[in-house]
Amino acid sequence: MTLSRTLSPQESADRLAIRELVDTYAHRADRRDLTGQLALFTADTRFVVYMDAASTEPTQDLRGRDALMPVFDDLNSYTATTHLNGQSRIAVDGDHATGESYRLAHHLVDWTETRTTTP
């Protein structure tokens, strides 16, 4: 079975640009760059998140750049974050593209102020 196909130079450039977009998103998330993160999305964006591997239903389905602000701002509640990007599937059709990217996100929380010991 052959999975390779010929890509035009333009489609190759488009796919690389989308992959760089995914990586820039993760970088800006880990730097707590809310303004920079939001700038990566169009006003009519759709942002779908699946956190439960056992479900086909999204955990979040947000529409529009403004809906992303509280989600991205919530990263400030963590001591540190690290986003590791995995595979991406990208479909390019002219000037429109859709895609699915896998990411492992680590969110570190400092519980020292709320931790209690049990006798």
List each language-model region with its residue ranges.
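Short, cysteine-centered beta-strand-loop-beta hairpins and adjacent loop/turn segments enriched
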Residues: H106-T116
